[in-house]
Amino acid sequence: MDSPYLEIEVPLSSPIHAFDFPQWHVPLKAGACAPRMTEHGEEIPGLMDGCLDLSITKHTVMMWLAALLLMATLFIWGNRDKTKLVPRGAGANILEMLVLFVRDELAIKNIGKEEGPRYVPFLLTVFFFILFMNMLGMVPWMATATGNLAVTMALALCTFVITQVAGIRAAGLGGYLKHLTGGVAPWLWPIMVPVEVLGLFTKPFALTMRLFANMLAGHIVYFFLLGLIFLLGHPAVAAVSVPFAFAIFLLELFVAFVQAYVFAMLSALFIGMSVAMGHHHDDHGHDHPEAGPSHDQGKAHHA
């Protein structure tokens, strides 16, 4: 007996291969990538079965396209003439405004005036790359690369690596490892070190899930509202769904900017925390030994 309910299958986890690019599968064990028949036809096993899929997907193409558009934007509106300090044109002014915002409000404010400029190129790259990928996802027949968990995880991994490098550079390898002990007695290290290491990975995990969930959720709501028109098949539904879908579309444009800003801001905040950890270690490692002789000289002068 047929079910009275309408069943809709949305394969969110399956890769979407773009155009007719050749597929590339790397077997992690012998015979792992051999095609097999399923209820949906012939399929290639996944990573859990020992087959690594390195094929070009639609999200991969979107990342390439975002990078090309970003480079073209910088080439067209970037001020290549060093003698002209004032940008000309609306595009150049908007670009300069965003660059100065990332430098002053994100890098310098969260990392510091001395160390902040060092990380401005990374923060600018993250901000504009995510922004362009988000905006491409709003174009019909395109895909939102930031709605892919693997993409957001890779971006968060970049921030994680930069954050750890910043901490090691500021505190030194010894100071960085000492920070993992939390400054507690050695007999508490077996408890404190795993907690600190877990804390290191919660930050990139939060970056991954925040960007992924926000970009995916908005598009699901948007397509659900439009899908109601075809599911219910009544003209009156369109009068309600279309205005709501348009409102969600405008909201998604705003969210595209906000999520790029939030990711860059949190990246700057995490880098600033690592740099501050190094300065805190230097203060405790150098200021206190110098206080001893000064204190002794003060007592001798008083005597």
UniProtKB/Swiss-Prot annotation:
Subcellular location: Cell inner membrane
Sequence similarity: Belongs to the ATPase A chain family.
Alphabetized Pfam families for the sequence: ATP-synt_A
Protein known as: ATP synthase subunit a
CDD domains for this protein: ATP-synt_Fo_a_6
Biased composition (Basic and acidic residues): 281-290
Biological function: Key component of the proton channel; it plays a direct role in the translocation of protons across the membrane.
NCBIfam families linked to this entry: ATP_synt_6_or_A
Membrane topology: Multi-pass membrane protein
